[in-house]
Curated annotation (Swiss-Prot):
Acetylated. Deacetylation by the SIR2-homolog deacetylase activates the enzyme. Mg(2+) binds at residues 549, 552. Pfam families: ACAS_N, AMP-binding, AMP-binding_C. This is Acetyl-coenzyme A synthetase. Its cofactor is Mg(2+). The keyword Ligase applies. It comes from Helicobacter acinonychis (strain Sheeba). Its EC number is 6.2.1.1. Belongs to the ATP-dependent AMP-binding enzyme family. One of its GO terms (molecular function) is metal ion binding. It catalyses: acetate + ATP + CoA = acetyl-CoA + AMP + diphosphate. It comes from the Bacteria.
Amino acid sequence: MQLDDDLEFAKKIFNPNRAFAKQARIKNMCEYKDLVHEANENYENFWGELAKQKLTWFKPFDKVLNSDNAPFFKWFENGKINVSYNCIDRHLKDKKNKVAIIFEGEMGDYNAITYRKLHSEVNKTANLLKNEFNIKKGDRVIIYMPMIAESVYMMLACTRIGAIHSIVFAGFSPEALRDRINDAQAKLVITADGTFRKGKPYMLKPALDKALANNTCPSVEKTLIVIRNAKEIDYVRGRDFVYNEMVNYQSDKCEPEMMDSEDPLFLLYTSGSTGKPKGVQHSSAGYLLWAQMTMEWVFDIRDNDNFWCTADIGWITGHTYVVYGPLACGATTLILEGTMSYPDYGRWWRMIEEYRVDKFYTSPTAIRMLHAKGENEPSKYNLDSLKVLGTVGEPINPTAWKWFYEKIGNSQCSIVDTWWQTETGGHIISPLPGATPIRASCATLPLPGIHAEVLNEDGSKTKPGEQGFLCITKPWPSMIRNIWGDEKRYIDSYFSQIQLNGEYVYLSGDGAIVDENGYITIIGRTDDIVNVSGHRIGTAEVESAISKHEMVVECAVVGIPDTIKGEGLFAFVVLCDGAKCNLGESLELLKEMNHILAVEIGKIAKLDNVMYVPGLPKTRSGKIMRRILKSIVKKEPITQDLSTLEDVNVVKEIINIAQMEE
């Protein structure tokens, strides 16, 4: 399918809105370049001054950056801080009656939570975790929750007492939930009875019951359940407790735990190319500093702004730009339960009109869906409150960018096409809305203090227009600190492939092109990760799940372009000897494999197409050559070296099958 379907438009340059630029924090490219120069001249002083100015410390740090044990970098060493204090308490002096969170439920219910109310609810929740569940500093708490205000209370309550939270996306299966509970060795799991989705109750507690069945998660002592949709659920005596009944008996005073700068703030599991999810570990001070700075620079957040990021808290975007970033700035953040399509495709635009949203941040998949399903819906609403639009999670194609720019932003709003990852904690490459001339589908320039470069495998810089590996060549405060419990995997995944001046640099796994102006365009993954609707899915875990089907001998999964999701999943499947597959059986097999994927991973992992083949192209060492399969799917000529293949004829047979199926 053709994604970049308006290439002429993609060549146009759009300058920032002049009226907006005049009052922006960074008003022009000269100011941007001054900040870049300042960071380059004295890197540690640049970050140290930002940390002193922007964060509230219980005890000042005495060293900005410690690289002695690289790549296990330490930032703001020996400083003492608490993230919940920085997100709530420090705002109470002059913002206690300001709305911190606007929540809108799927069924039309609404709640505005002030900073004073947030302080009270978080403290009561923190006391509940301490007093009734014996949660202490360093304990891991799994949060398997929908998009409701209580989810934020749980996150901030953990940070207040020094517990490490790990949020599992509420769409993940019991098996995926179990894997994450066990890897984190979580002591407590917090969930809801359910939520509302498309106007109907959607249950979560039964999935937790399955995950914990037969004592398969021995570290879990108790579970805490928030009653949301009030549907009947099963309770296990002595294990399951109801939040709503217990929290009101707790004091609303809870002193924040004094945390070291480098104490883990949270774990967030992301897909790994080897199949087992990786527990990305983030620190307290460095992560929060960059969450706040990117809110100020990239979104130019203002005191009277209503900020809406549509991401789920189960993803890093929800962590940084629904919760920690906006609240660190003392801003107002919106939380929406349910889907964009209920009761109709005008829901999001209606919310922007009703709440006078100033800054709006969403995914290209959502934009493409809204464009395809409700192209004329935006014209029914007043969207003139919008000042900055943002995209996240995947590259955005020019047609979607154009519609977003013209129809949602009325050709007046800068679009900040942000590139970053779970591992980076916050934005790495992005336009600045008051300064950067923008181009459709281009992430533009690294932010001040960030050294992002496009390199060849030998560490040399690519020439303009050449594709290379996107790397970050200097440490930054919000970077991943480790993979939970697996230092070797941390090094192997990020710091083992490309060297610059004899030192391994951070390898993002994304391919990119830099132009003669230094603008960076993201091409997509270079490893075995597929980006479906902005969600990273490892092909290894998909293949592992499919292989559980009794008729499947082996399989290989690759990403394919999709006009709505960005990428879809295409499987090459080898069936058992003698197994035949007519059209009807093929469709039934596809249905069965997708059922397995829904159970093993979740409904976000769904095969869009399958091809039944006699074998897979493998090297003599047994490695599947997925690049060849990608070329076949895209109908591109096979340019890869086939001399290392065990059986070259397999490629010819697959090409013949592909041509027959056209």
